[in-house]
Amino acid sequence: MPAPSAIYPSLNGKNVLITGGAEGIGAATVERFALQGCQVIILDIARDLAQKTIEHVMSLADKTGIWPSTIMAPVFYYCDVSNLSEVQTTTSEILRKYGTVHVLVNNAALTGHKARLSTEEVTSEAWDMNINTSLRHVFFLTQAVIPGMKHAGGGSIVNLGSITWRIPDPAVPVYGACKAAVMGLTRAQSKELGPFNIRINSVMPGAIATQRQRDEVLTPEYRAEVMRSQSLQRDLVPEDVAKVIVFLASDEASGITGSSYVVDGGWCSDP
């Protein structure tokens, strides 16, 4: 990969915590922050995929020509975000070791076939799994990093939403409800924490051609539906989303909070 398309000096040396950073949008975001000179911390359950992401990032260090001496290897912490106790224990360990988390990216969510359940198919167990994996940890990770951000004079939190609740997508009613709730959290907490210079924004991806989506969801029929719905006639890729996340975390976006940025190729056609 070439050097990042935009360099944000304000991010150099910052600690960035990314959930679900082993693959897909998360992995692309790990790469983008690492190339900005950040210490990236990955929370995920996919240890092997996380290691591949870390190795890939480090293979780029000599190819960018941008701050080669400050590209730090991302670090991985095994954490099942659906397990609140595990989230809290792991976060406490990270905060003890790294101090302040300057940027939090709440990306992890239940996706693929596990999230594609109709209303009649959703059991109480499936409901809890969706809520715990796609929503609950967003609140409690934010809660955990707030004290350090306040002490540091501010910080940035980027929550990953989705256009599924805006379309709306009847195939994922619980997932859509979780992502609508993420929007509500973003708006409420941005008001609550703005006085402390903590900015909270969300990014709402559309149909992003991650490897998991290609393997599980992006059939020729579904891709044809995506192309009919999008204005842009190309597959959107994880890097399209990652670039927006990094911008929102930087000081270039210092006046932006409580906002949602849609990356959907024109599917919704409004903010």
Regions found by a protein language model. Name each.
Residues 2-8, 111, 115-116, 167, ...:
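Short C-terminal tail/terminal secondary-structure segment
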Residues 115-119, 123-131, 226:
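Substrate-binding pocket helix/loop in short-chain dehydrogenase/reductase
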Residues 117-118, 168-176, 188:
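Active-site loop-to-helix junction immediately N-terminal to the catalytic Tyr of the SDR YXXXK motif
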Residues 139, 150, 154, 234-263, ...:
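C-terminal substrate-recognition "lid" of short-chain dehydrogenase/reductases
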Residues 142, 178, 186:
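Active-site helix of classical SDR
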Residues 162:
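Residue(s) in the substrate-gating loop at a strand-loop-helix junction
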